[in-house]
Amino acid sequence: MIWKYLTQCLSQFKLLFWIFIISITLGASYWVSNIEMSYEFAKILPADDPDYKVYSDFKSTFGEDGVLMVIGVKDSTFFTANKINDWFLLTQKLKSLNGIQNAVSVLTALKGHRNDSTLKIETEPFMESPVASLSEIQKLKAELLNWPIYKHKLWDPEHHVMLIGVTFDSKTLNSANRLALIDSILMPCKHYENKYHTPLHYSGMPYLRTHIMKKIRHEMMLFILISALVSIGILWLFFRNFKMVAISLLTVGIGVVWTMALMYALGYKITVLTSLLAPLIMVIGIPNCIFFINRYRKALVENQNRNKAIEVMVSSMALTLLIANVTTAIGFAVLYYTNSAILQEFGITASMGVMLTFLITLITMPLVLHYINEPFEKTKKTTEWKWITLFLNRIETFVFHKRKTIYILTICISILGFWGMNYISLNGYVIDDFPKNDIAYTDMRFFENYFAGVLPFECIIKTQDSNGIFKNNARVLYKIKRLERMMHQYPQFSEPLSLVSGIKLAHQMDRGDSKFYSLPAVEDLKDLYERNSQTETPNPWLKPYLNAQQSQTRVSFQIADIGSLKFNALLNEIKPRIDSIFPLNTYTTVLTGHSRVFLKSQSYLQQNLIESLIIEIILIALVGLLLFRSLSIIVLSKLPCLLPLLITAGIMGFADIAFKPSTILIFSIAFGISSDGTVYFLTRFRNEIKRGLKFHEAIRVSIYETGQSMVFTTIILFFGFIVFGFSSFGGTSALGILVSITLVMALLANLILLPCILISLQNRIKPIKEHITPNTIIDDEHH
């Protein structure tokens, strides 16, 4: 048989296999050292999604919308010479940094006046040099109050809040340099904080993205270390043998290196999901080692011959573990069908990594065991676990004497699961992965309190003609004025920035009084344009709000992080009102921006969970069908796999855990791993029937023979995944806790519910022997 032949090859060509493994591992290690972090925001929506396409078109026309970082301070004693001057110098310092397009505070913002000789507008900043006297401070404050455009954009005079807006260069924004640049921004800000003992607040998409990436980088290394320590501890507890612990760690370590190198070869970068790959592969790979080592030790006790024990180990376990790893890999691979880039990258790499790690285990384990000289008596002693035997005795009692109770409990748990599942929240937030006490969370709430929010939201108005924005006596501008007045009714939105804002500012500059901060009449607008058309735009906000053909314009808002449910309800309310201002037969209006794309992703995830789970169930069922050739057995065997998922969904609902990229993985991972237990049990059960055991006796033997390794595996996986529960990211933490719970439920379902189902329906399904064909029999002669 192929497995026996493989064992012989490994024994005969040990040196060649070692050269092969070591060479690839060294090359892979070099690739791993070149893996980069992803500095772009997670792409959940597929590229062909209508809203994503609109957002992409917007960025190609007007540029990135998430380039603004904001720095704020609340200080009722701000208007003193030292604080004003230091705030001014801080703004200038930030503006001078490489990678920063602009930095502006209300102190460096533009004011202007009309030159009476040229009749053109001339501009200058409020401050060009530090102030010294009280009269200068009073004059400055009075001037600032005279310019309405800056209120609630760069400062909030009623609540004594000042703000600096820092605009990033888009090239720097999406590169590794952003992390160093953020540090360069924070350094002088911290100096200001320390000098005046006043906390500054930071937010905006560049800051939030950097905050996330720093956490990812820190947690990735931390989880790898903790996962390794947990694996060492549990392996030592199980085997009490340093050599066996070292073999297992060596095997999964090579698997991790190969997997990460594969990610590099595929051109993927480290994201919030792919950062989990290394500890995940480590956790999933360890059970392969446990099954092989347990079988090797048992065969060693029986045969007292190392070579024979290795041959029995491979022949007995290889196909079973292959099928189990295939089902686990399918759980990840189905994420490819989501058409979501971040999920596809994770799914492809994880599924291939699982199979690579299995292949490495299959080759490395026999190679290393050839050099291990373990005393037989010691091996026999360490394969006996009294507490597991007691546990399995209790399982046997439940299966053969408490089936009715088991079914009643299963029905009750299922009802609770369905009930809780109805409460699963689809209400996603941009920062709901952060704990409530995280600085990024509290700072965002600060800006929402005083400036409505920091998340970009855009309203695009498209006309049908070139220069359409200014045709028909600039009718579009007056419609935008109505739009802004209408949006002012919604406190979730900040004050807008648009062409109208810039023209109102120019009108005030031209007339010299704040009462002229308004959109002028048509004739006055034409006059203002003609007098200033040959000069540079007097307002830096005009140019970014027009496309090259002057057929499109944008009205930019910031919005609070109100959650996807409220956001969608808000869109449904304001879109018809916008369309009433801009009739569809003449104009096209589009609502977009990073906030809309991100929040739409939440509903997209729900749809893809259902699709990917259905595909996963079908694929794993097909694998089982190849093994057992019985549709009835396959259908029944899926019940113990689905019950843990139902329990998990119920817990998510009752615990108010929302769908997000990390929590959606719970179901794919858990179902794939739960199916492993089903494969282990049914394979053993089928082989016992093949040996000629009676139905009940075959089930009893299967419980005891597979139970020990399944318990070992569950303990390893439980503690491996529970590590993620300590993540500061809410989704990753939920992933770790819920997968751990699901695995325990899957263990109980496979050892209790699955045997109960087989016993109850033994007379209603075809005899198992009918489903055993020569090409599906596992060589279990020595198992």
Question: What positions do the PLM features span?
Answer:
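Helix-loop junctions and hydrophobic alpha-helical segments within the transmembrane domains
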Residues: A299-V326, I689-F712
